[in-house]
């Protein structure tokens, strides 16, 4: 089954546009786990178990594991998600971007070591830095397009004078991803919820690509505006929330609180799509 098939299936089965981001910070763990990087797996597995029927995807951020030498815990978590929520796709948030030979190694890491269904990538180095991931037929790749951080304007909103129509950089990325780069229907785009007008612009340029949309929750993105701007019958959206769900409570009932926060976010997204 391809990533896009898994995504559509989980969206329908769980009636959800919500992606639960897994960005574990031991210093923010609840009492009993707080400060213990050896318990990253335990914390994340509890979140997964509490939200698996509410999510259309999970998105572990690799840096939050690697910073604590917890790659083996991430491998274990990936196995756990496969065993307990096999219908929910996993997007490895790695934002890799390097020359082809190095990209091939990163693709092995994402799809063979961790068994992810999709990965996030930086397209800054061009198509040959993306192509090795597309050799894994059925896997997905989300390209950074218009990101939610304020500094995204530094490059993404600059005009390309040498390209026909002088598009903004993020517009050019969207066109390339919808068109010549998307040879096997594996690409999607990352567009921040903090810029709903630009979500709408990206959707106009890439009408069928899945959009991974971070920034709802702690970053302040509006759920209803996000869905209205990005969702189309043939263009799915995957709306990520991480901290607002993970750290909904600092006590031993953190998993139940995470479930409550995830359900509230899912319901808000569903209300926006009607």
Curated annotation (Swiss-Prot):
- Record pathway: Pyrimidine metabolism; UMP biosynthesis via de novo pathway; UMP from orotate: step 2/2
Keyword line: Decarboxylase, Lyase, Pyrimidine biosynthesis
InterPro entries reported for this sequence: Aldolase_TIM (IPR013785), OMPdecase_AS (IPR018089), OMPdecase_type-2 (IPR011995), OMPdeCOase_dom (IPR001754), RibuloseP-bd_barrel (IPR011060)
The protein's annotated catalytic reaction(s) are:
orotidine 5'-phosphate + H(+) = UMP + CO2
Q: Which domain of life is it from?
A: Bacteria
Gene Ontology biological process: 'de novo' pyrimidine nucleobase biosynthetic process; 'de novo' UMP biosynthetic process
Q: Which residues carry out catalysis?
A: 95
Name any one GO molecular function.
orotidine-5'-phosphate decarboxylase activity
Q: Return the EC number.
A: 4.1.1.23
Looking up Pfam families in the UniProt record yields: OMPdecase
Which family is it part of? Belongs to the OMP decarboxylase family. Type 2 subfamily.
Do you know which NCBIfam families this protein is assigned to?
Answer: pyrF_sub2
Instruction: Return the protein name.
Output: Orotidine 5'-phosphate decarboxylase
Which species is this UniProt entry from?
A: Paracidovorax citrulli (strain AAC00-1)
Question: What is the taxonomic lineage of the source species?
Answer: Bacteria, Pseudomonadati, Pseudomonadota, Betaproteobacteria, Burkholderiales
